[in-house]
């Protein structure tokens, strides 16, 4: 089995400006191999696996549904996940799915790539998918899991997260068939399966293997694993800790939802910090060109300010505006750890001093809503923050958080040109640009 270093060394997305290191109390991390300038690209990573974030059977959003699972009324290419323009004559469907779309609609499936046929932005994407991510087995499995086979109905009565887990497992098992080497990389990523498979693994493994057991590849010397309950549980653990969401365009009301999830083998090694020094960008809807059409799902990580050699490079796993209690809850539930970064230490002291979490949240919200001019007054002339400021992250939010209403994205300069830093800041959520007039 490949080691983490093998993964980092073999993936073509790896760059010479970061290296793997062991940091006490944090485990494996990516650190700067040299001094980095603001806006410098430290990683460009391609996914080894992508799957749709749209449930097999979409339902009307409910207040209890996570905002990231509430989807706008858009369709996406089932290969590159660009927005589909149905008026375009190049849009094509999967030849197998389109044969069953009418039957699926009768059973309540519908169409448009959500629960009926799978659509592609053109013949090239369809050909690529049919040979990789949307093989005949995937097509059959998704159709049966969706609603074409009556015995799959129990899945459709489960919450939408379970349906997305089913999508992931189909994609992961297919990866084992079409690319055993990439499947090995997936298995090497962080995420330990529980000693005993949980309810999700038990249910999904039994369901998938009763409806559409994956075929074993023939004549592959690389194939040395078997599809088992233990493997299903291990895969779900990898997905939980390593999947990155490719976001839909920011809605007018500020809703942030995911169009697809991807496993990025190098980007998975970035640790979290609540005041990150880097942020990731994706350009899924970038115009397709002869050279870029296959790279639109890449992740690009840029540092947001100068970083000295040897410093760990961290991302925030969620929008930086979340308050202390929400951040700790998400990190504990989704990633299994408690954050002790500098920001969390300060805000934990607020909580201890006040003795009331509600007061802490209220104080944060008030600070977040302060006028930018007032925040700047709290900063020192050299760009630092006044030591007596009760909100020591004010400068970070002022300079590196997008001020577009309901966006909460992180700003990073465009890459330097000929060694000269850019004064243009780009938001990694809404894509807005602004001139950096901070000192």
Give residue spans per PLM region.
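N-terminal alpha-helical interaction blocks
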Residues: 1-52
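A short, polar/charged loop/turn motif at coil->beta-strand junctions and beta-hairpin connectors
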Residues: 11-14, 71, 264, 396
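Short hydrophobic-aromatic micro-motifs
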Residues: 32, 42-43, 120-121, 270-271, ...
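A general structural signal for short secondary-structure junctions and capping/turn motifs
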Residues: 32-35, 259-262, 304-307, 331-333
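C-terminal SET catalytic tail plus cysteine-rich post-SET Zn-binding segment of SAM-dependent SET-domain
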Residues: 52-174, 274-439
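Catalytic cores of histone-lysine modification enzymes
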Residues: 156-296, 333-334, 340-343
């Amino acid at each position: 089995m490949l080691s983490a270093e093998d993964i980092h060394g073999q993936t073509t997305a790896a760059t010479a400006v970061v290296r793997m290191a062991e940091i006490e109390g944090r485990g494996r991390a990516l650190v700067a191999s040299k001094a980095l300038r603001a806006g410098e690209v430290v990683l460009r990573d391609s996914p080894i696996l992508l799957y749709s974030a749209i449930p097999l059977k979409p339902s009307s959003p409910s207040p209890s549904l996570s905002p990231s699972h509430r989807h706008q009324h858009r369709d996406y290419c089932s290969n590159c996940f660009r927005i589909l323009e149905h008026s375009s004559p190049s849009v094509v469907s999967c030849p197998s799915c389109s044969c069953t779309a009418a039957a699926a609609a009768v059973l309540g499936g519908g169409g448009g790539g959500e629960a009926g046929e799978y659509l592609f932005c053109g013949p090239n994407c369809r050909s690529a998918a049919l040979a990789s991510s949307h093989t005949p087995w995937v097509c059959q499995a998704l159709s049966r899991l969706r609603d074409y086979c009556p015995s799959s109905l129990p899945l459709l009565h489960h919450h939408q997260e379970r349906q997305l887990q089913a999508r992931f497992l189909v994609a992961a098992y297919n990866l084992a068939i079409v690319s055993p080497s990439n499947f090995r990389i997936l298995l090497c990523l962080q995420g330990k399966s529980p000693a005993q498979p949980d309810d999700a693994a038990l249910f999904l493994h039994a369901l998938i293997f009763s409806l559409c057991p994956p075929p074993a590849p023939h004549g592959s010397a690389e194939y040395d694993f078997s599809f088992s309950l233990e493997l299903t549980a291990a895969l779900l653990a990898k997905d939980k800790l390593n999947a990155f969401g490719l976001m839909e365009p920011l809605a007018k009301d500020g809703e942030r939802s995911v169009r697809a999830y991807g496993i990025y083998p190098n980007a998975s090694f970035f640790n979290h910090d609540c005041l990150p020094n880097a942020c990731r960008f994706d350009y899924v809807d970038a115009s397709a060109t002869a050279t870029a059409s296959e790279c639109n799902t890449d992740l690009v990580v840029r540092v947001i300010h100068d970083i000295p050699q040897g410093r760990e490079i961290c991302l925030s796993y969620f929008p930086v505006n979340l308050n202390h209690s929400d951040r700790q809850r998400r990190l504990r539930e989704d990633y299994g750890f408690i954050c002790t970064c500098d920001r969390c230490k300060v805000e934990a002291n607020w909580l201890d001093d006040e003795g009331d979490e509600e007061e802490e949240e209220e104080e944060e919200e008030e600070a977040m809503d302060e006028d930018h001019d007032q925040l700047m007054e709290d900063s020192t002339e050299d760009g630092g923050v006044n030591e007596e400021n009760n909100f020591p992250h004010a400068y970070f939010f002022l300079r590196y958080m997008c001020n577009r209403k309901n966006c909460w994205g992180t700003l990073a300069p465009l890459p330097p040109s000929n060694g000269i830093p850019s004064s243009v800041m780009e938001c990694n959520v809404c894509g807005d640009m602004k001139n950096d007039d901070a000192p």
